[in-house]
A protein has these predicted regions:
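Small-residue-biased structural context
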Residues: 1-219
């Protein structure tokens, strides 16, 4: 059977569905595949100053990771995918949110003298994201997902809008931290927390992709 290939005429989401393991490259290039999954791949790639033909060639050279569970998500039932999202994204991300909050609070005290202005901004932006996500996850788990699995018609437009709002805040955080770049005098905690924020961003993008581009489209 011929291998499916990514073409420049696809949307970003369609390209990811061909090979979910291109998510890592898209994340590295800061190409939005979650809330921006509906956008043309050509448009998203060229907006980053990349040549679409060479970029698509690179994407098609990415070998699927055999141990990866990403491709399995496309074969899951609604119930299996909901369970996967809760276990692999909601639970770990709630822990990350708490961990990052505590780490940023510590950094505010340790690096107050030289970096309080930047850290105030980062802390406030991050806490705004956390304030959005904690009730969002709870609503999905306690209301929207159970009704959806029970066969009820669920309007996901509100959740998608919330995803987009959080995505915009996350993009702003990405920019003000210069892609989570630590200042030259940053301590080990500084490095760890900024690394954790970068990992959280990538994980949340993948999480939102599974919801917007797979789960919410299921009948």
């Amino acid at each position: 059977m011929a291998k499916d290939v990514i073409t420049k005429d696809m949307t970003v989401a369609e390209a990811v569905k061909v090979n979910p393991d291109i998510m890592d490259i898209l994340a590295k290039e800061n190409i939005d595949f979650c809330c921006g999954g509906k956008h043309p791949l050509k448009e998203a790639v060229e907006a980053k100053g990349k040549d679409i033909d060479s970029f698509v060639t690179m994407l098609n050279q990415v070998e699927p990771v055999k141990e990866s569970t990403r491709a399995d998500a496309f074969k899951m039932s609604k119930a299996e995918l909901v369970d996967y999202i809760i276990r692999h994204f909601h639970r770990p991300q709630l822990e990350q949110l708490d961990q990052i909050e505590m780490g940023l609070a510590k950094l505010l005290n340790v690096h107050y003298a030289h970096h309080h202005k930047e850290l105030f901004d980062v802390y406030k932006r991050f806490m705004s994201i956390k304030a959005d996500l904690v009730p969002h996850f709870a609503q999905e788990e306690q209301d929207d997902f159970p009704r959806f699995l029970n066969g009820e018609a669920v309007d996901f437009s509100e959740l998608v809008a919330e995803h987009e709002a959080v995505g915009e805040k996350l993009e702003a955080l990405h920019e003000v931290t210069n892609n989570y770049q630590v200042p030259a005098d940053g301590c080990n905690t500084y490095h760890y927390i900024f690394k954790l924020m970068g990992e959280f961003e990538r994980s949340l993008h993948e999480h939102i992709f599974y919801e917007n581009s797979i789960l919410f489209l299921m009948k």
